[in-house]
Structure formats: structure tokens, C-alpha cells
């Protein structure tokens, strides 16, 4: 999975390595891994509870709270490390012609290692504090792509 790949040793904040008990505990409900419920009826993934990755920007195991907008979109690009581009389609009204035109916007979002995201998947993202210069959203749920629809196709409302 996402083991130690950085130069500095990665560890979860708030979880120390020196424990009084000598028996080994596996990560999970009784183990020494920090995870939380983000609320808003989003379940914590099993990989976040039982996994061994360390991500301080993960909403389930890191120091990030979800507040503000909850949006849905289609994954356009997943080439960046732990970051995806989400395409949101919408209709814009033109008063002169009394008609709507199709428009879209691209939103960069942080994706936790507990999710397996591919291009074309539908994701639910939640707003959080600024994680970098452009990233202000975090992936909360992934809905796998059902059919062979393209990633640039306009989805209905």
C-alpha cells in the first residue's frame, strides 16, 4: 500500500510508539491507529481503519475537518500523487436567448490512499481548509464507473 516512501519517517500525529503493554496489537478498533468519523453520514472506509498508510491530509486519519460544501463530480485526471481533478458540469442561463448553455469547471481534490480512484469514476468531495495553493476539497466517497461513458461526456442532472 502506501508505506514509507519519504526521506523522513512518517507517523500519525497523536499516536506514540511507546506503550505500556508488551503484546502486539494489530491496527483497528483496539489497535494503535488513529481514525475518526467525519460525520455527515459518510462511513470511514475499512482501509482507513485497517491500513498502514500515513496521510496528514486524509479526512479519516489526518488533521483535516470537512466543513462547507459537499459536491459531486466525475474524475477527469488522476495523474498527480494523491490529487485528482474533478469535472463538474452545470447549465448557465443566457437571458437574451432565454436558453441554457453547458459549462463545466475543474476542481482539484486530495484523495486519500484508502481510496482506489480511476478516471471516469464519480466522487463525492467535501470542502476543507486549504491543503495547498489550489486544493480546498477532499474525497469522501468513490462511486465506481458503471458503464463505458467517457470522462468528458456531459452527465445529466
Curated annotation (Swiss-Prot):
InterPro entries: NA-bd_OB-fold, Ribosomal_uS17, Ribosomal_uS17_arc/euk, Ribosomal_uS17_CS, Ribosomal_uS17_N. GO terms for cellular component: cytosolic small ribosomal subunit. PROSITE patterns: RIBOSOMAL_S17 (PS00056). Gene3D superfamilies: 2.40.50.1000. One of its GO terms (biological process) is translation. One of its GO terms (molecular function) is rRNA binding. Keywords: Ribonucleoprotein, Ribosomal protein, RNA-binding, rRNA-binding. SUPFAM superfamilies: Nucleic acid-binding proteins. The keyword Heme does not apply. NCBIfam families: PRK08572.1, uS17_arch. Belongs to the universal ribosomal protein uS17 family. This is Small ribosomal subunit protein uS17. It comes from Dunaliella tertiolecta. The gene is RPS11.
Amino acid at each position: 500500500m502506501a508505506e514509507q516512501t519519504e526521506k523522513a519517517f512518517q507517523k500519525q500525529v497523536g499516536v506514540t510508539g511507546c506503550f505500556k503493554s508488551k503484546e502486539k496489537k494489530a491496527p483497528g478498533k483496539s489497535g494503535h491507529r488513529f481514525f475518526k468519523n467525519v460525520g455527515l453520514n459518510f462511513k470511514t472506509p475499512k482501509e482507513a481503519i485497517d491500513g498502514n498508510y500515513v496521510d496528514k491530509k486524509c479526512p479519516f486519519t489526518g488533521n483535516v475537518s470537512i466543513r462547507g460544501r459537499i459536491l459531486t463530480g466525475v474524475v477527469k485526471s488522476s495523474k498527480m500523487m494523491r490529487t485528482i481533478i474533478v469535472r463538474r458540469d452545470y447549465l448557465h442561463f443566457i437571458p437574451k436567448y432565454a436558453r441554457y448553455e453547458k459549462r463545466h469547471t475543474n476542481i482539484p481534490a486530495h484523495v486519500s490512499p484508502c481510496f482506489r480512484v480511476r478516471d471516469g469514476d464519480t466522487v463525492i468531495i467535501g470542502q476543507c481548509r486549504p491543503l495547498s495553493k489550489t486544493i480546498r476539497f477532499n474525497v469522501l466517497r468513490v462511486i465506481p464507473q458503471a458503464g463505458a461513458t467517457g470522462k468528458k461526456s456531459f452527465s445529466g442532472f
